[in-house]
Every structure is written in C-alpha cells, then in structure tokens.
From Swiss-Prot:
Quaternary structure annotation from Swiss-Prot or TrEMBL: Homodimer; the beta-strands of each monomer intercalate to form a hydrophobic core, while the alpha-helices form wings that extend away from the core.
Family stated for the protein in its record: Belongs to the CsrA/RsmA family.
Keyword field contains Cytoplasm: yes
KW RNA-binding (keyword) present: yes
InterPro entries membership: CsrA (IPR003751), CsrA_sf (IPR036107)
Entries under PANTHER family matching the protein: CARBON STORAGE REGULATOR (PTHR34984:SF1)
Organism: Clostridium botulinum (strain Okra / Type B1)
Protein name: Translational regulator CsrA
Main location: cytoplasm
MF terms in GO: mRNA 5'-UTR binding
Gene3D superfamilies: Translational regulator CsrA (2.60.40.4380)
Listed Pfam families: CsrA (PF02599)
Origin: domain of life: Bacteria
Gene (UniProt): csrA
C-alpha cells in the first residue's frame, strides 16, 4: 500500500487519466474530488461492499417458488 501526504488543493495522479484532489479537510474527514473517465465506476468502499452483498443474495434465487405463480 502506498501512503501519500497531501494538503488542501494538492492532487495525485493514478495512471494517465485519474486525478484525485484534496478539496476540504475537517475534523476527522477529508473531501476528495476525483477526475476520471465517465466509463470508470467509482464507489465508496462501503457502498461497493453493499452492492456485492446484494448481488450474492440475488444469486441465491430458488426457482421452485415460481411454481406457486399462476399463469394467465
């Protein structure tokens, strides 16, 4: 893991097309601005983990419950 110290207004580059800038520093939190291609999905880790968990739940579908549905 790379650890970098940045001040407000300073940036770091990831590859050729991603720039992360420190926008604001508060008590115990940092606001970051991320400039990246629109095709790239950027999620907070806790949201990513939540999406992964929902995807796992969706794959546990039991097709036998469809037998109770009447067709028109």
């Amino acid at each position: 893991m790379l650890v970098i110290t940045r001040k407000k207004g300073e940036s770091l580059l990831i590859g050729d097309d991603i720039e992360v800038t420190v926008v604001k520093l508060d008590d115990g939190s940092v606001k970051l601005a991320i400039d990246a291609p629109k095709k790239l999905t950027i999620l907070r880790k806790e949201l990513y983990n939540e999406v992964q968990e929902e995807n796992k739940k969706a794959t546990n579908f039991n097709p036998s419950i469809l037998k109770n549905i009447k067709s028109k």
